[in-house]
């Protein structure tokens, strides 16, 4: 009897030991980290950091998995539904809503270290906040800037804008006119994705487009501030026809680079990270510079959708996953990731790094814009992807090509007042399938107050 009791106690102790938190029975914890880094410097920096983590954390190993921006949404959805999602997920804030509402992402608000939570500004946290939860850590972002042919600017004797004294939108139009000549355009607008580019730049002119009422419902109203950027693009292409070509309206940013290098275009509005491609591809005799985008009533304000790091709701080691994210986003490491991707870090300490304040390759110009970056206007609007594809993109494409008028755009918007909507208070919170959007302030109020 005594032998059987002793054996039973031994078995019980073994079972209890196996259930003890932080003491995995099968050896070190393994976290699967899917990265979307794609530029050579960015991939190298990310893999180096994973290697450094593994060398100093023998009990928590990280497995690097290469993902792709081209297919990340569908790939993640498939992996979530199949129970094969990575533990740590690299994505962008404008792609998180469906996953947060579907219960696929972990709420990080109770897991974030105080250092990390306080280092990233509240506005950046809002991009990854849904209801009462924080479903991603925003860490890299990029403003839209003007990449300009420095020799053309000098020859035209135009005023060179700075973050402290940018061009206004009317002045930008006049400069484009001065830079125009036979077979040469003042500016090229690559607008393969016209909606996000227009909405984000329109914040500089006081545009909002999406208006949330006291009942938390969203309506679409195309007002004076929303007209400025749209009218500028339209007029440069369809009215001042020689100032901007219609042929680039359906192009991606990279498609315009040969024309910029060859002197066909004097300026191209591009994301800040395109500088890496320019450094790698531009002829040696091509002289270029980075200029801030034009400013209006809202100053240099722009909308952005930062890159994010999230944790799968099914991850059995969430604390370890957040610890790894915290390691990746230590100030110096965040700088390494930003330099590798040619983007700006969200962290206030990382933004102070001297490497981001050099005039070389326009780093200082971009860093000066960081304080003016705000959540993209559509971040908190449910139904936005469908509205963008079915309503907004065709409307902007017709208007920019000269096939319709601003009144037509306004009329198209007027029929979509109820297309985009947040959840009602009766909806379950994010984390539960078919959940809805609630007041974003609920979660951010629990984060430390930051700039």
UniProtKB/Swiss-Prot annotation:
Cell location: Cell membrane
Lipid attachment points (S-diacylglycerol cysteine): 19
Keywords: Cell membrane, Lipoprotein, Membrane, Palmitate, Signal
Membrane-topology annotation of the record: Lipid-anchor
Main location, first listed in the record: membrane
This protein's GO CC annotations: plasma membrane
UniProt cross-references to Pfam families, sorted A to Z: SBP_bac_1 (PF01547)
Coiled-coil segments: none
Protein task: May participate in oleandomycin glycosylation and secretion during antibiotic production.
Protein name (Swiss-Prot/TrEMBL): Uncharacterized lipoprotein in oleD 5'region
Organism, as annotated: Streptomyces antibioticus
Keyword Transferase part of the UniProt annotation: no
Region (Disordered) residue spans: 424-451
């Amino acid at each position: 009897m005594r032998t059987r009791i002793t054996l039973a106690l031994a078995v019980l102790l073994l079972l209890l030991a196996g259930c003890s938190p932080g003491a995995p029975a099968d050896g070190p914890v393994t976290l699967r980290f899917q990265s979307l880094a794609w530029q050579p410097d960015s991939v190298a920096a990310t893999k180096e950091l994973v290697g450094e983590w593994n060398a100093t954390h023998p009990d928590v190993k990280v497995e690097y998995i290469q993902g792709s921006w081209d297919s990340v949404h569908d790939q993640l959805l498939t992996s979530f539904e199949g129970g094969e999602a990575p533990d740590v997920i690299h994505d962008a804030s404008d792609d998180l809503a469906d996953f947060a509402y579907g219960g696929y992402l972990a709420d990080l608000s109770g897991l974030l270290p105080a250092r990390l939570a306080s280092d990233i500004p509240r506005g950046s946290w809002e991009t990854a906040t849904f209801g009462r939860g924080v479903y991603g850590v925003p860490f890299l972002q990029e403003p839209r800037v003007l990449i300009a042919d420095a020799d053309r600017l000098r020859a035209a004797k135009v005023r060179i804008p700075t973050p402290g004294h940018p061009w206004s939108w009317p002045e930008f139009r006049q400069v484009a006119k001065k830079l125009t000549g036979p077979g040469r355009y003042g500016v090229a607008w690559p607008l393969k994705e016209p909606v996000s580019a227009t909405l984000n730049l329109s914040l500089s002119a006081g545009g909002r487009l999406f208006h949330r009422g006291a009942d938390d419902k969203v309506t679409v109203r195309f007002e004076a501030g929303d007209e400025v950027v749209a009218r500028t693009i339209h007029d440069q292409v369809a009215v001042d026809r020689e100032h901007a070509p219609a042929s680039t309206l359906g192009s991606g940013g990279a498609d315009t680079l040969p024309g910029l290098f060859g002197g066909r275009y004097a300026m191209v509005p591009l994301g800040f990270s395109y500088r890496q491609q320019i450094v790698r591809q531009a002829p040696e005799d091509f002289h270029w510079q980075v200029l801030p985008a034009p400013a209006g009533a809202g100053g240099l304000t722009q909308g952005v959708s930062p890159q994010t790091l999230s944790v799968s709701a099914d991850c059995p080691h969430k604390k370890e996953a957040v610890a790894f994210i915290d390691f990746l986003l230590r100030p110096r490491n965040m700088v390494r990731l930003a330099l590798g991707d040619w983007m700006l870090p969200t962290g206030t300490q990382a933004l102070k790094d001297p490497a981001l304040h050099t005039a070389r390759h326009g780093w200082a110009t971009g860093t000066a814009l960081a304080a003016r970056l705000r959540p993209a206007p559509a971040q908190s609007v449910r139904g936005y992807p469908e509205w963008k594809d079915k309503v907004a993109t065709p409307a902007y494409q017709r208007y920019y090509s000269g096939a319709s008028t601003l009144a037509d755009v306004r009329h198209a918007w007027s029929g979509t007042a109820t297309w985009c909507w947040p959840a009602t208070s009766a909806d379950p919170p994010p984390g539960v399938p078919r959940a809805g959007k609630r007041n974003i302030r609920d979660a951010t109020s629990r984060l430390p107050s930051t700039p």
